[in-house]
């Protein structure tokens, strides 16, 4: 934050060029979670962010939200539902859903084992040098 640039940064933050939609989830009449999503070309849905309050982990609100949104996408005749970005071990759960695919840099693939391994490797990267080595190895694997 630089002094005297507050007005520009406030304007920048207010101008969101993506027309996000929101699903808000309630428990006992209180909002406890939300998903931010975007519909592209009236045919594909991309979730951008999911957040919840962690007060009732046994509710499984993340799984509930994902299944609800997939069902909503099907009922609204969207072709694809993209469950946001995938990286690090925290994203492995995304591969449990039927029809799972991920972008490998060249094409969409459904290799869940490779996806899980890539997520685990992401978690272990701590330096730019490690990232560079990882990227070289990754693209060598995917480009033959």
Identify the role of each PLM range.
Residues 58-71:
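Conserved acetyl-CoA-binding loop-helix of GNAT-fold acetyltransferases
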